[in-house]
Amino acid sequence: SGLQFAVMDGQGFLPFPRV
């Protein structure tokens, strides 16, 4: 989701920037 820290996203926890 383009975030730079671990956050609850649609795919789950994403501890890295995602686009």
UniProtKB/Swiss-Prot annotation:
Keywords of the record: Amidation, Neuropeptide, Secreted
Source taxon at top rank: Eukaryota
UniProt modified residues of type Valine amide: V19
Gene Ontology terms describing biological process: neuropeptide signaling pathway
Record localization: Secreted
GO cellular component: extracellular region
Family per record: Belongs to the periviscerokinin family.
Described function: Mediates visceral muscle contractile activity (myotropic activity).
Protein name (database record): CAPA-Periviscerokinin-2
The organism of origin for this protein: Lobatophasma redelinghuysense (Gladiator)
